[in-house]
Amino acid sequence: MNNMLGYLRNYKRESVLAPLFKMLEATFDLFVPLVMADIVNVGIAAHDLHYILVRCGILLVLAVIGLTCSLTAQYFSAKAAVGYSTSLRHALFAHIQSLSFSEMDTLGTSTLITRMTSDINQVQSGLNLFLRLFLRSPFVVIGAMVMAFTVNARAALIFVVAIPLLSVVVFGVMVITRPLYKTAQVRLDRVLGLTRENLTGVRVVRAFDKEQDEIDRFENANDLLTKMQLHVGHLSALMSPLTYVIINIAIVALLYVGSIEINVGGMASGDVIALVNYMNQILIELVKLANLIVQVSKALACAGRVQAVLDTKPGMDFPAELRSEVPADKAGDAVRFDHVSLTYAGAGAPSLSDISFTAKRGQTIGVIGGTGSGKSSLVNLIPRFYDATEGTVEILGRPAADYPREALRGKVNVVMQKAQLFGGTIRSNLLWGTPQATDAELWAALETAQAAEFVQAKPLGLDEPVEQGGRNLSGGQKQRLTSARAWVGKPDILILDDSASALDYATDAALRKALAALPGSLTVFIVSQRAASLQHADQILVLDDGRLVGLGTHDQLRQSCPVYEEIYESQFKKGDVQK
């Protein structure tokens, strides 16, 4: 938690001035009852209008000064809180970018979004309130008691009894409700999670006619949240009647003692009014202090969750520069797996077991297997999205761990299973990996990806707007644009992770033909469920339950690998010839 305080270092001045100006405001507030007492004791008693007007002028000055101090304190506290949350959000976002896929999988996308948004907002609100009240409220409570003793020591003894009773009620309710607020926050997170899940998967929900089930699930979670919030609200509502009962009893006692003191000449009627005002000030500040503690407790809980993400250490260490030279005997290697195994964090069994193969520069490597066989897991090791649990992955003759992040990702480009585009234009999406690419290079990449025709048909061409997630494009268009984006930078290794699933066979075949015609020694890994897409590959890797059960050409595997033959036969009738 101390690390998070470091983000306040640029706002030290505001963090000091905000509570100081609040204390100044409180100081002027403490003088108001005394001025009121003077008006009653002197001005009204003597029917001195001039005295009353002068004292009213003093009250007005105190109010203006107090308001100025309050607004100034609010400005400084808001500036510090907003600046702090902005710095914290930037740091958290930057830290998330440094995490590997393993940490991202463990934390979860919805959790990280919650930390970035509602948790940091709660920390900001708590800090803003803390800077304004953590000195003011105790100062007013103590100051009001001291001022009461300056008015009349005997009557002020009532404060000595009333303040502990008020404190017991206020802080007792706070202690009881504090853990309930935490439970309510957990249930609120659950409701938000269900909402996010439903909106993300709305097409699947409707495809399976599960709208009513989702409504019922949401209502159950929402009912639990509502019941908890009502329970907390009922307990919190006890604070007002109980505190006002104590205050009213204390005021009655003050009036009783005051009347006796007035009769014996020990105090004036205006002094009683001052004591009642001080009692009300104490009540207000105790309630504020209790609310402050509740809000700060929530903020600290949220800060702890943010800190937990910041404390998550990246599982991968990328060197600043290349660590090794390429041995002469590996100069022609593009990718080499040497007895590689992979077990995901928290998984009970390995996703890949003892995988070994070598892909030469310029080769096309097919990867095929059933659902859950480990195809994506295998290709994700090449750009080092994950580190192998056992064995070594070598890229262009060097261990993948010897490459700086930028160098490795510059040599290996990936077209993901799920096509992801970002809000902007077609041009801005294509320039993601290679900002300096020319229009000619962009159009060449679009031609290769079989996307040039539909981009040319757009009114603005490369400058056609793309909505967030590519919502204004079809699935096939998105896949072709992500493919074009991948080879704009002319990588050494290109991975197509089932990236043609939304394309028809003719477009898929044209894309593979265009890839084969690219100049240079581009090594291509094609992950596909279609045997026809891979039959012309130089090598085909056949995976089954995380193991490499076949390695060879299409014809070789049909003779030697039952798993491949089964996949092939399930897609084509016997005797069909694929060309």
Walk through the language-model features, giving the residues of each:
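An intracellular "coupling" helix at the cytosolic face of ABC transporter transmembrane type-1 domains
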Residues: 10-13, 98-102, 118-127, 131, ...
